[in-house]
């Protein structure tokens, strides 16, 4: 059985599976709705400023390039290391898991193929764990 018959992660296949920029934008909008709504995310929501527009835009732009689409983040802001960009935050297991829960709920709300939903969440676990590892408080 081939686990990735849709070739996610190859060229722009993940970007297309996510619905390109419009689909990524919907995902990120829903992600922050989840962060504002679920009790498990209160702590990580407080890490963000009151105005979510700047971080929303950055996440949309980052995911565009990360998923194989246009590299909007680097065009607008330059290069990025996700772990180093989040190093100042205290991200332990609880915060990592809350972030992943928000993303899982947002992904589940998207019209993606089930195989892409599983793939995307598995891929997002990698940078989430790296952020925890370099955090000011990785416990």
Residue ranges and their predicted role:
Residues 1-139:
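Core of compact, soluble alpha-helical bundle domains
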């Amino acid at each position: 059985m081939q686990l990735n018959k849709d070739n996610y992660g190859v060229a722009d296949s993940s970007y297309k599976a996510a619905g390109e920029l419009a689909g990524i934008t919907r995902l990120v909008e829903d992600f922050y709705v989840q962060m504002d709504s679920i009790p498990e995310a209160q702590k990580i929501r407080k890490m963000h400023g009151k105005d979510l527009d700047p971080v929303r835009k950055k996440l949309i732009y980052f995911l565009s390039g990360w998923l194989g689409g246009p590299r909007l983040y680097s065009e607008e802001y330059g290069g990025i290391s996700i772990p180093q960009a989040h190093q100042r935050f205290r991200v332990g297991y609880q915060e990592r898991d809350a972030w992943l829960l928000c993303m899982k709920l947002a992904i589940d709300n998207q019209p993606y193929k089930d195989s892409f939903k599983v793939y995307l969440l598995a891929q997002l676990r990698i940078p989430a764990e790296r952020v925890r590892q370099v955090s000011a408080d990785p416990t």
